[in-house]
Amino acid sequence: MFALTAYRLRCAAWLLATGIFLLLAGCSEAKAPTALERVQKEGVLRVITRNSPATYFQDRNGETGFEYELAKRFAERLGVELKIETADNLDDLYAQLSREGGPALAAAGLTPGREDDASVRYSHTYLDVTPQIIYRNGQQRPTRPEDLVGKRIMVLKGSSHAEQLAELKKQYPELKYEESDAVEVVDLLRMVDVGDIDLTLVDSNELAMNQVYFPNVRVAFDFGEARGLAWALPGGDDDSLMNEVNAFLDQAKKEGLLQRLKDRYYGHVDVLGYVGAYTFAQHLQQRLPRYESHFKQSGKQLDTDWRLLAAIGYQESLWQPGATSKTGVRGLMMLTNRTAQAMGVSNRLDPKQSIQGGSKYFVQIRSELPESIKEPDRSWFALAAYNIGGAHLEDARKMAEKEGLNPNKWLDVKKMLPRLAQKQWYAKTRYGYARGGETVHFVQNVRRYYDILTWVTQPQMEGSQIAESGLHLPGVNKTRPEEDSGDEKL
């Protein structure tokens, strides 16, 4: 009887211990942190991306790029630090994203695809782009999908463009194309530009950011409807981080953050055209080296990026020290007599003096702007004032404020500047008529030149990206450049 009771007690103890163990295991499983909680606990948001002008790169001032800026804002929303990781190619990006302990998300100009891949999910879209077939100027232009048959075509391996071509091949079995994981969009455009391949397929935003580096490339036709870019997150049923991402992107769209980033990175592209891009490429080789040291010296003295000063000089005179306009402004920085005297310039035709004087003048204008105007808008406002004068710029700011816009944001004020040339508007201003539309173009051009100079001079540029052009833009005869006098009438 006692033995039976002891046996029952042992069984009860075993069952109790087992129950406690299972209960603890269940509690442990229930308390496993979500993806969002892990990010917040670690204090770091790990984001994987691609190294390209349209996504992420480093310049003199550090990390930058559309995707970087957007991811940085998201990290700030979460109250954590942003850590950027770069992938060698798209397959590598998705592989790292799906591995255990990998990055929290991918922000790399991705279009949702890979429907059969359960290891990845996509957020709400935030930027509409159009896939485009790219060909080389001077070659026969394809106008329809069947024209791709028989052409040398290369696209990024693992991209949505490769999926599009795979679908097209079902309709045209003779279609041939190559997928490569050893190149980036920049490389594909270069290969079309120099004739190594006949065609490629890229998104419209990538082309917009890169076309000026490759002035021979052209759009053949849009390959399908516009699609939205999205962030990618690891697959699974944990929606905590995904919900936060979607809420952030929706708010960024509603509150204008996405529009401001689009303006910053894409709002000033496509302003040069083929002739302007090709000419600038030549002048980078033939003219800038003569004056680069002067720009760098002024930039160092004034604590300003020398490439922005050089961009102003190019917009003003095409880097021609003897340039003269009908209004009497002269020299590489096109200074008036009054400005030259105020800046201590005794000879406007001396390139060193002109660069020093013009640079000093620009920095002075920027320093005198209201403190409420922050960078990068502050530099764009300074460019506008450099061109049109501070008084007219103030008229445009007041006009923006009356319209319910932000007088401290370039995106808003640039909408008002063209009104200064319309009587119904300038009649109500303090300083009257001004060619405000020209000022908008001036700022757009300087920003574009500045972007190009920033990209081609950045120290981290990799061998497969631009380096083959020897830090000069491709599409230019590098062996026998045509010399120019450097002095032309404007």
Swiss-Prot record:
Catalyses which reaction(s): Exolytic cleavage of the (1->4)-beta-glycosidic linkage between N-acetylmuramic acid (MurNAc) and N-acetylglucosamine (GlcNAc) residues in peptidoglycan, from either the reducing or the non-reducing ends of the peptidoglycan chains, with concomitant formation of a 1,6-anhydrobond in the MurNAc residue
Location comes to:
Cell outer membrane
Its membrane topology: Peripheral membrane protein
PROSITE patterns the UniProt entry points to: TRANSGLYCOSYLASE
Please give the chief subcellular localization of this protein: membrane
The UniProt keywords, alphabetically, are: Cell outer membrane, Cell wall biogenesis/degradation, Lyase, Membrane, Signal
The GO cellular component terms are: cell outer membrane
- Function as written in the Swiss-Prot or TrEMBL entry: Murein-degrading enzyme that degrades murein glycan strands and insoluble, high-molecular weight murein sacculi, with the concomitant formation of a 1,6-anhydromuramoyl product. Lytic transglycosylases (LTs) play an integral role in the metabolism of the peptidoglycan (PG) sacculus. Their lytic action creates space within the PG sacculus to allow for its expansion as well as for the insertion of various structures such as secretion systems and flagella.
Q: What is this protein called?
A: Membrane-bound lytic murein transglycosylase F
Source organism: Pseudomonas aeruginosa (strain ATCC 15692 / DSM 22644 / CIP 104116 / JCM 14847 / LMG 12228 / 1C / PRS 101 / PAO1)
